């Protein structure tokens, strides 16, 4: 997949669901994985020719694992000329040491999103972009069917009224295979998660 195709997929999702308006300040959640780096690259590319002017701010929630190195992500954001914030937390200690959770992912996700949303508001952003793609939509829907007995998945665009924050998912029309191909072609600095629960 080339950059032009990436921009095309991303722009179509943004236009179809009215994800970006004039003057938006969009935080992009960066895990260091292939999906979030692709999203950041796509949005930066779209900034050059999208009819609505918007700003970006990359942000990573550091869960507190000692072996996480974000230097490559810092350099990547610097190359793209996007401000980058690392939010340091003790979430790993709370989940694994204090609470000793047998199923840590759910609590970690809640705490991570809570910390992220608060920091985003502090930065003055009005939207947060997540890098969920088409495969994530299908997987979430199937998990919902298996565990809840209903078809349910996340929306392309969601307004969080308590936070006065809008969540957008611009990679919705892309397959994971497309993302992998793009990351490999452009040699993005993917950072492996140090989390012991991350298969």
Segments predicted by a language model, with ranges:
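ATP-dependent adenylation/nucleotidyltransferase module used to activate substrates
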Residues: 1-141, 147-150, 155-156, 177-185
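Short, flexible loop segments at boundaries between secondary-structure elements
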Residues: 153-178
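Substrate-binding/catalytic lobe of Class I Rossmann-like enzymes that use SAM or dcSAM, i.e.
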Residues: 181-199
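Short, surface-exposed acidic/glycine-rich loop or hinge patches that mediate macromolecular interfaces
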Residues: 63-64, 173, 196
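Short, acidic/turn-prone active-site loops that include or flank metal/cofactor-
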Residues: 148, 156-158, 194-199
């Amino acid at each position: 997949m080339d950059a032009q195709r990436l921009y095309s997929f991303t722009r179509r999702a943004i236009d179809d669901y009215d994800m970006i308006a004039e003057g938006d300040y969009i935080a992009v959640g960066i895990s260091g994985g292939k999906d979030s780096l692709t999203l950041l690259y796509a949005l930066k590319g779209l900034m050059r020719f999208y009819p609505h002017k918007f700003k970006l701010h990359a942000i990573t929630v550091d869960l507190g694992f000692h072996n996480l190195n974000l230097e490559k992500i810092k350099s990547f954001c610097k190359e793209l000329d996007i401000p980058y914030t690392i939010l340091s937390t003790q979430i790993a200690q709370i989940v694994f040491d204090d609470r000793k959770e047998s199923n840590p992912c759910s609590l970690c996700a809640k705490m991570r999103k809570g910390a992220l949303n608060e920091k985003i508001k502090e930065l003055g952003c009005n939207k947060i972009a997540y890098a969920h793609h088409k495969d994530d939509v299908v997987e979430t829907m199937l998990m919902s069917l298996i565990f809840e007995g209903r078809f349910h998945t996340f929306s392309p665009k969601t307004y969080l009224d308590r936070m006065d924050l809008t969540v957008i998912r611009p990679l919705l029309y892309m397959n994971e295979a497309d993302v992998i191909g793009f990351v490999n072609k452009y040699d993005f600095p993917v950072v492996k998660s140090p989390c012991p629960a991350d298969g």
